[in-house]
């Protein structure tokens, strides 16, 4: 919730607070295509690594609520080697590494920093508790795919999960 989500162009596309509610988040994220990107700066990484944060489900099992993510540096480095994390000293550098337009990602980061400083999200109305500046390098971009964690309705099945209707 406290992190900036962008699409493959570097544009912020929804209120990240919705990640608390997976069905709503999934619908917003699905429109971005195959990949979604989470962007944060060194100050946020340091806070998660040393203090933890009280966000509900900040990154599933990756970062636990109210617990320091002492493994965060190692996880970022390991996933950088796999091509799922990009690290750059400037927002433009990390954008290029992630294949995004540097000006677009910079505009998204600058806008989020402005919202964090003013305590109000003028774009999507995210609660001020979750607003985080993206201004202190190095910068991190984590690439992820949408996973379906819940479903609404679907096929009718019996107690053995056998489909009841051929349609």
Range-by-range predicted roles:
Residues 104-167:
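A glycine-rich dinucleotide-binding beta-alpha-beta segment and adjacent secondary-structure elements
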Residues 1-97:
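An anion/pyrophosphate-binding glycine-rich loop and adjacent beta-alpha core
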């Amino acid at each position: 919730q406290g992190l900036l989500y962008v699409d493959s162009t570097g544009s912020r596309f929804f209120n990240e607070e919705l990640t608390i509610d997976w069905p709503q988040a999934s619908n917003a994220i699905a429109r971005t295509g195959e990949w979604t990107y989470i962007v944060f700066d060194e100050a946020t990484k340091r806070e998660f690594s040393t203090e933890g944060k009280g966000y509900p489900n900040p990154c599933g099992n990756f970062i636990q609520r109210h617990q320091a993510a002492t493994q965060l540096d190692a996880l970022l480095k390991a996933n950088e080697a796999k091509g799922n994390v990009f690290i750059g000293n400037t927002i433009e550098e990390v954008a290029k590494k992630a294949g995004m337009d540097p000006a677009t990602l910079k505009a998204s980061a600058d806008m989020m920093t402005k919202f964090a400083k003013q305590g109000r999200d003028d774009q999507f109305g995210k609660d001020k508790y979750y607003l985080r500046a993206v201004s202190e390098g190095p910068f991190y971009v984590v690439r992820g795919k949408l996973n379906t964690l819940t479903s609404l309705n679907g096929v009718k099945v019996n107690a053995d999960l056998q489909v009841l209707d051929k349609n």
